[in-house]
Every structure is written in structure tokens, then in C-alpha cells.
């Protein structure tokens, strides 16, 4: 087990993230899904260059809700992270001149995100605790967990995890429970993630049966990974023009 403090100036960073960084809390989902897609795209690149020789079957990002546990989870089967990766990209945030920068750009969320790569930390806007469970594509590397309650302190442990990739588990704040509603999450995914190049899955498709909607066995894929502008006109169907 490893415990420690994140970076050197995060005592100043977290209140900004929690209260001021984003005027619209829904942005967190876009940021986390974007990171998950990036992890999958990086795996494809490693495969193309011969650095990864494993399977590329069924690459996807999955969003799941557990109302009873109060959690929202974003899962990808991309490159994953080693313990060193987590320490480098999550714990050791190198904020050169962070205080001065935040003072200058505290009203401009996009500038801060672009400058520091703070996308992951947007999770704390809606969460009282965030967990990472991840396993690298690199053979022999143990899976690790990372847990933080929004303070600068974190805890890391080796864990058992069979599959490659990363789970980001958000323990949703009591005053942010709207993000445990599937209809709300699906609407946000369609708004921000409709044209991403990796399947984004939110639960199962539903059908009307015996007076109510029930889940089918088919994944509810939010996005279109082959948009019409990438197709030849001769290959388009009537419904393509409608959708």
C-alpha cells in the first residue's frame, strides 16, 4: 500500500476544481469519456507499431450506474496504467507557477484544462470519492487501485484485475444525484460523445414488453463510429439522411 499527497500545490487546486473550474458540472462526463477513448486509440497505435501484439477485439467505453452503491463508472479496455503511470499522471501533477496561472485564468475553465490536462480531476466536481482500478497492457505489470476523497491525500494498492484497461468509479455527491439517472447520462453522452471513434455503451437497449420497458441483450451504443461524412454517397441509406 502506498499513501501520499498529490503534487505540491494541490491544496490550492482542488477547491478551484470543486467550486470554480467548471460552471457546468456536466462537463466531467465528457472529460472522462474522452480520456477513455484516448486510452483505446493509444492501444491501436501501439498495435500498429508492433509494440502491442494482443487482441483489439471489442474495444469500447462503457458507462454504468449503480444507484444502490451511488456510483457512476466509466470503463475502457485501452492501454491501462502501471503503478508508475498512475504516480506520474495522477499523483505528480507538475504545476509550474500554478498559483499565478490560476489567479490569472480562474474564470477561464478551458485555459486551465488545456494548460494542465486536468480532465480527470473534473470527476471531483460531482464526487465525494473517486477510485481508479487499472491494469496495463504490459505483461507482468500488477493491477493497481487509486483512491482519493477530494483532499490532496490518496491511497494506492495492488489489486486483482483480470482484464486490461481502466475503471474510473465516481462515488456521486449527495447533491449531484441527477448523475445517477440513466436518462440524464444518456442525454449527456449524446450531447458530447455522439461522434467519437470508439463505441460508447450505456446499458442495454430496451423494448416495450408486457406494459413496460425491459432491457434486451443488445448493448445501447450511444454514438455512430462511422458518420455519414465518412461514407460514399452510393453507400448511404434513406435513414442516414434522416438521422
Q: Where would I find each of the regions flagged by the language model?
A:
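GHKL (Bergerat-fold) ATPase N-terminal catalytic module, capturing the glycine-rich phosphate-binding loop
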Residues: 1-174, 178-179, 187
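GHKL/Bergerat-fold ATPase module in large chromosome/replication-associated machines
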Residues: 112, 130-153, 174-176, 183-243
